[in-house]
Amino acid sequence: MKSVEEQLALIKRGADELLVEAELVEKLKRGQPLRIKAGFDPTAPDLHLGHTVLINKLRQFQDLGHQIIFLIGDFTGMIGDPSGKSATRPPLTREQVLDYAETYKSQVFKILDPAKTEVAFNSTWMDKLSPADFIRLSSQYTVARMLERDDFDKRYKSNQSIAIHEFLYPLVQGYDSVALKADVELGGTDQKFNLLMGRELQRAYGQEPQCILTMPLLEGLDGVKKMSKSLGNYVGIQEAPGIMYSKLVSIPDSLMWRYFELLSFRSMEEINGLKADCEAGANPRDIKIKLAEELVARFHGEEAAANAHRSAGNRMKEGELPDDLPEISVAAIEDMPISAVLNKAGLVKNAAVARDLLASGGVRIDGEVVDRGFVFKLGATHVCQAGKKAFGRVTLVSEESSK
């Protein structure tokens, strides 16, 4: 096992906040594997690179010799996490949650070592709690403290409803740490309230409180908003190798090092070496190719990574995107048909040409042929190809933000 200092440096890499660092140092000094917990509510079947920030950190803990607990919130998934939400989320059925959970497991084991990963379901202990147990759990926190959360506070002050079951979510997540006797819990920055709840409940139940490590929310391909499927600025880990490759090669230069730090398994020493190469005149696109190949290999295998540049779809005669791929912003007030976007982006002479290209299969979005039914989402960024020679990395921005 690495020294405490070496472990701490890797643990803190890319992290937003570590609470409490001195406590974690003491835990590490004992020289025993720590129980590292991260919970995931399977509320959608497909993961994107934003989800993998936490999973990558779990892998780093795993490589340091610690016990990883990949907690699937099949019980909490039926409540719905209210974090950052302005309205009550519709609950999922147990069948939906379990179906999604199986899909999650097949995806996360492309990152985690399944032989060294403990998979847990929080229904295992939550289903056994009696009404009296739930009342005891609920008595550990007050409504006033719950309303300190920004999302609850905003909804309360704007007279929007907050269902009682939503107050239970952070309590249940906190109780998961009690049930698992977690030493460390990971979560996104939007989960800090829930993670701290785990510390408080562990104290209340006579356990040593866990340390918490918050990880940043990964920016999407637009470099501004968090990665989200609904915003169209995501890279899905099950996307075809060529599509994944083309999206990653076309990220803004300003986003490149952020992605390396949070998504790459290269050491910081190696990443700093790549930065030095870039400062010495290396083409940033060549550096992004290294990142793209690493991630394609992780999720699709080495052979797929070696061929990804030729299967990217957005290719010229040598199977490559142009080095000078233009960055194009198109202002809009709402989602827009692809024909209008191509016209406004200047990738076609007029709307009629756009319609003709769409009808003949001459338009590709992120490597995939699309037809006139494709809708460009407001805030989304895509690599667009119209015909054989017109390329652009197009972002549909709000007219308000473009003023």
Swiss-Prot record:
The lineage of its organism: Bacteria, Pseudomonadati, Pseudomonadota, Gammaproteobacteria, Pseudomonadales. A motif ('HIGH' region) lies at residues 42-51. Pfam families: S4, tRNA-synt_1b. Signal peptide: none annotated. NCBIfam families: tyrS. GO terms for biological process: tyrosyl-tRNA aminoacylation. Belongs to the class-I aminoacyl-tRNA synthetase family. TyrS type 2 subfamily. Homodimer. GO terms for molecular function: ATP binding; RNA binding; tyrosine-tRNA ligase activity. It catalyses: tRNA(Tyr) + L-tyrosine + ATP = L-tyrosyl-tRNA(Tyr) + AMP + diphosphate + H(+). Residues 336-396 form the S4 RNA-binding domain. Its main location: cytoplasm. ATP binds at K229. SUPFAM superfamilies: Alpha-L RNA-binding motif, Nucleotidylyl transferase. It is an enzyme of class 6 (ligase). It is found in: Cytoplasm. A motif ('KMSKS' region) lies at residues 226-230. Its EC number is 6.1.1.1. This is Tyrosine--tRNA ligase. Keywords: Aminoacyl-tRNA synthetase, ATP-binding, Cytoplasm, Ligase, Nucleotide-binding, Protein biosynthesis, RNA-binding. The keyword 4Fe-4S does not apply. One of its GO terms (cellular component) is cytosol. It comes from the Bacteria. It comes from Pseudomonas savastanoi pv. phaseolicola (strain 1448A / Race 6).
